[in-house]
UniProtKB/Swiss-Prot annotation:
Species name: Shewanella sp. (strain ANA-3)
Protein name per its UniProtKB record: Lipid-A-disaccharide synthase
Domain of life (superkingdom): Bacteria
InterPro entries attached to this UniProt entry: Glyco_trans_19 (IPR003835)
E.C. designation(s): 2.4.1.182
NCBIfam families per UniProt: lpxB
Biological role stated in the UniProt entry: Condensation of UDP-2,3-diacylglucosamine and 2,3-diacylglucosamine-1-phosphate to form lipid A disaccharide, a precursor of lipid A, a phosphorylated glycolipid that anchors the lipopolysaccharide to the outer membrane of the cell.
Pathway involvement of the protein, from the record: Bacterial outer membrane biogenesis; LPS lipid A biosynthesis
Catalytic activity line of the entry: a lipid X + a UDP-2-N,3-O-bis[(3R)-3-hydroxyacyl]-alpha-D-glucosamine = a lipid A disaccharide + UDP + H(+)
Any one GO molecular-function label of the UniProt entry: lipid-A-disaccharide synthase activity
Gene that this sequence comes from: lpxB
Length: 385
């Protein structure tokens, strides 16, 4: 364990899921180094633990190849400023949390300056653009992976990697309490609820709010007594969703909640959601789900040429088979979504729940503590390449 009186960590988290991981890692590091300093880009959970943000996390929350290109000048400015600030700070370690297209380039520059670098959350090199592994090898001293099958890929390419599990699997109980979640959210304890999660980023809502709202109308026709509840990450996303609701289903009642996505999923009988980390959370909460996603046509055409897998959601990737329905791009239509939700709400969930429980146990590793131990070991290590 490092004996230095004050350790300094530079960190960059690009979105909500990274903020959750970053806060968990900070809390674990603070157990042994209570006066450690944390600087870079973080979200509200990290800032609540004393993180010093140089830029708002929202700066990095962009999706899709085409969308990133439109923001490229600003992203390059942010990265350039961070390189300067972090190089001057000379931290004991830099930890890039997810956001690989931003962080790997940043790590490459910082490592060249003699700063130890960690990438927390393996990019999906096993799924698309596998040659990124060579850049990752140059940019990082260590990768912290969340999924067990990722480490074998890094071992094959002789890139230092530690499987730490997922902090969500540690935080979420093996059996979620629907009644308590409904009480907290002041929802009817007897009604049937579908949670609708169209994503946490503006670009996601731009693509998904309309088909999700239209699908809700069709679902209401199948299940006249069903109710809808939607968590929105902030006021901007709420306004975006309200606009879609007003435009496409002005008479449909959807109960909106700011934040509390985990509680909303726990309170629900089924979940319709965007592909992403939320699918892992839904799996850990153990609810029937339908995963849907689409991006701009050009982004999709470019991405399709680089894909190495035919599954997108984390439950299916972890299981190695189709456990939950995925409706991607051209299949992401109100009609197909409504049909899939109907099937999931009516089918026997027992075998799927058993698989979710198996996967939950597999990912329960005290991730934040394991990640902190790996980072501190790197800080103490001599002769690191």
């Amino acid at each position: 364990m490092s004996k230095k009186s004050q350790l300094v960590f530079a960190m960059v988290a690009g979105e909500l899921s990274g903020d959750i991981l970053g806060a968990g890692l900070m809390a674990a590091l603070q157990k042994t180094h209570p006066n450690a300093r944390f600087v870079g880009i973080g979200g509200p959970r990290m800032e609540a633990l004393g993180f010093e943000s140089l830029f708002a996390m929202e700066e990095l929350a962009v999706m899709g190849i085409v969308e990133v290109l439109s923001r490229l000048p600003r992203l390059l400015h942010v990265r350039s400023s961070l390189i300067k600030s972090i190089t001057e700070l000379k931290p004991d370690c830099f930890i890039g949390i997810d956001a690989p297209d931003f962080n790997i380039g940043l790590e490459l520059k910082l490592k060249a300056q003699g700063i130890k670098t960690v990438h927390y959350v393996s990019p999906s090199v096993w799924a698309w653009r596998p040659k990124r592994i060579f850049k990752i090898a140059k940019a990082t001293n260590m990768v912290l992976s969340l999924l067990p099958f990722e480490k074998a890929f890094y071992d094959k390419h002789q890139v230092p990697c530690t499987f730490v599990g997922h902090t969500l699997a540690d935080d979420i109980p093996l059996e979620s309490d629907k009644a308590s979640a409904r009480q907290l959210l002041e929802l009817d304890p007897e009604a049937e609820y579908l949670a609708i999660l169209p994503g946490s980023r503006g670009g996601e809502l731009k693509q998904l709010a309309e088909p999700f709202v239209k699908a809700a109308l069709l679902i209401k026709q199948q299940f006249p007594d069903i109710r809808f509840v939607t968590p929105l990450v902030n006021q901007k996303r709420r306004e975006q969703f309200e606009q879609a609701l007003k435009a496409h289903a002005p008479d449909l009642e959807i109960h909106m909640v700011e934040g509390k996505s985990r509680e909303v999923m726990a309170a629900a009988d089924g979940i319709l959601l965007a592909s992403g980390t939320a699918t892992l959370e839904a799996m850990l909460i153990k609810r029937p789900m339908v995963v849907a996603y689409r991006v701009s046509p050009l982004t999709y055409q470019i991405a399709k040429t680089m894909m190495q897998v035919n599954r997108f959601s984390l439950p299916n990737l972890l299981a190695g088979r189709d456990v939950v329905p995925e409706l991607i791009q051209h299949d992401c239509t109100p009609e197909k979504i409504a049909e899939a939700v109907g099937v999931e709400l009516n089918r026997d969930f027992t075998p799927i729940k058993a698989e979710f429980e198996r996967l939950h146990q597999m990912l329960r590793c005290d991730a934040s503590q394991k990640a902190a131990e790996a980072v501190l070991a790197l800080v103490d290590a001599k002769d690191v390449n």
